[in-house]
Amino acid sequence: VLIVSARSTAYSVAPLIYGFKHFNPAVKIAGIVFNQVSSPSHFAYLREACVDAGVECLGYLPMTEGLKIPSRHLGLTLTAKRSMNTLIEQAAELVEKYVDLDKLLSICHRNFPCRYTLPYSSEIGVESFAPSAKKMKIAIARDPAFNFIYRENIDRLSALGSITYFSPVYGSDLPDADLVYLPGGYPELFARQLHRRKKLMEALRTYAEEGGKILAECGGMMFLTRSLTVRQGGTAYAMTGILPLDCTMVGARLHLGYRRIEYKGMELRGHEFHYSNVVAPDAMPSVAKQFTARGMEVSTPLYRYKNVIAGYTHLYWGETDILKLWEV
């Protein structure tokens, strides 16, 4: 189902819809829901465009001021859970009113021939993992600085053992764990607070030196470097120092795109989305090759120090046994 913004467009959206329908034969556009529709008469033009483009129109969401979420340099501004729940409830009411849910649900039960592009095997599951893996203790950083996490990754980890969340920003101690997961987020907005967490940083250094498994993505990787500089001429805030690297927001340039990673016979998928840079990325050799969705090799590194694996790419594990990262 394709969601199409109808802002500042009407019937002229037809070529766009037609293009999505025919551009990639492996992608089946089963129906369209329009967003930001200004009026019923506006929707009438959009529905006509769907008919002429040969795609089912499932309905629309009217332009609603209360549903707008502010954005910032790495996407949406994260709001309090309570206000987000209110927003979701409001959106759900509009969906029930303006979207043909019966038609949408009927589409969900159709069989569409397609070609999978992500690693998938119906034979791979939690039961195929090592029995001892189910008893793992897993610590995950989760707070305003570290919160870019695929829900499926959490589900994977939950199947492997018990999860304990901790907060580097608010001064949590490092939980007792067999695996520490430091996801991405906004460490640059909390560099001063993170810099003050000496006890946690010392615990992470000890954990790493003793061979503890750490997986750090993007902002999590930045926390493991020696320093983080937020602005030109500003303080280079000391970070954990596990990786002999330095990160900076100075000269920030957007790096983004889907990534395919080749690492010692494994293939992983994910995405890269950040403005920061490693000052001297070659100070540590990359242990993997990374490619765009079109197969072009990129310079994005994946670092490894003992059992610490870190890089800018946010990994989507799919049905990949992530523990194999430490077996190869």
Predicted segments with their positions:
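Conserved acidic residues
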Residues: 1, 30, 178
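Short, solvent-exposed amphipathic alpha-helical segments in soluble enzyme
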Residues: 17-19, 47-51, 153-159, 196, ...
